[in-house]
Amino acid sequence: MTAAIRTKLSAMMFLEFFIWGSWFVTLGTYLLKDLKTSGIEVGAAVTTQSIGAIVAPFIIGLIADKFFSAQKILGALHLLGGALLWWASTAANFSAFYPVILVYMILYMPTLALVNSVSFRQMQNPSKEFPPIRVLGTIGWIVAGVLISYLNWDKQGGEAALVNTFKMASIASIILGLFSFTLPATPPVKRGENVSVGDMLGLDAIGLLKNKSYLIFFIASIAICVPLAFYYGFANPFFQEAGMHATTVTQSLGQVSEILFMVMIPFFFVRLGVKKMLAVGMLAWALRYVLFAYGDAGSNYWMLIAGIVLHGVCYDFFFVTGQIYTDNLAGERFKSAAQGFITLATYGVGMLIGSLIAGQIVDNYKISDTAHNWQTIWLIPAGIAAVVLVLFLLLFKDKNHMETNPALNLDEQQDMRLDV
């Protein structure tokens, strides 16, 4: 891969996640403060990510893999997405906002796979060449948060400026849309082949569920996405109400933590194994929400920061470890199908259920238009994570020890990730 191609791919990855990070982190605050929505409506808006994740395999399987070059589809989707994001910024109420953002996420979620496809097709050694390019995506997400706080769009009492996050994302999406047509040619790989629904959804890997331990892990993965949905939808509104300054850039510490813990996964994997790694990840979810429940912007401010920084443990130790576990258990034939299957289950089904539950609970503990009983709200997902952890420890038997060095497989997982 030449330096010019590496630069283009890095810019593509930066913009891909800059766009998402520009509006998604502050979505809950924008909806609650600007559009005066309910918690249920915020949850519904967050479920658009899940719906997009469910639809994405069909767009990739029916269009990208069979008929058109990946970089051209990427460009078209981002140009359309840019127009939709600007349209979303003009919505005066939730009924006008929701259908626009739903269509946008159905178009955006497939681009996460497309940027990986464009990248991998240019590489001779993906395990070494991809991670430095993928990390630019996380940096793009962080930079978006820094800009939002630097421009004071998320300052206390100034939430009306958050509409600008959609405009910033719109402009970046149009730039990436145009830029995509300059990317290296990535022709369809399955032109003329028949692709079944099972192929697109990864259902060929459903046989893994015959393994009792994997079935327990699979159910736990869906269940742990319920607490995850609370963070995605309501962390930013909580920090705002708690009195935290520069909430968006502060939340980006979670992505910094994620990068650091990603590097340390091989070290811990060798010493802890699959079961303990997954358990630590679930324990971290419970702990972070307890910290949020008892933290504040005063003497317990450290609890809020600690809860944010735990994101690296929460995500990497459970979800990335789970991807490695799935990859090794599936075998060479079903690797891709297995990853698609677990992604559909977690970010599709699990997050969808979790977002709806989170929205209902936030509404149930609303005190006024500007205040909620956050302590109770956060203790609920903490309890859910704790119950999932206990059941997992009792039922999961780590009979399938990793036979390969997890450090060799770690880089391969990064293309499957939807989170940053």
Per-segment meaning from a language model:
Residues 88-90, 173-184, 379-411, 418-420:
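Multi-pass alpha-helical transporter architecture, strongest
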Residues 150-171, 360-385:
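A membrane-interface helix-boundary motif in multi-pass transporters
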Residues 55-69, 152-153, 260-274, 362-363:
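Helix-to-loop junctions at the C-terminal end of transmembrane segments
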Residues 1-3, 183-219, 412-416:
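Juxtamembrane intracellular "pre-TM" segments in multi-pass secondary transporters
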Residues 2-50, 213-251, 319:
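Helix-loop boundary and gating motifs at the non-cytosolic
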Residues 72-86, 276-291:
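Structural signature of the two symmetry-related core transmembrane helices
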Residues 14, 84, 94-114, 118, ...:
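Hydrophobic core of transmembrane alpha-helices in multi-pass small-molecule transporters
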Residues 55-92:
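Conserved MFS/SLC helix-loop-helix module at the cytosolic interface between two early adjacent transmembrane helices
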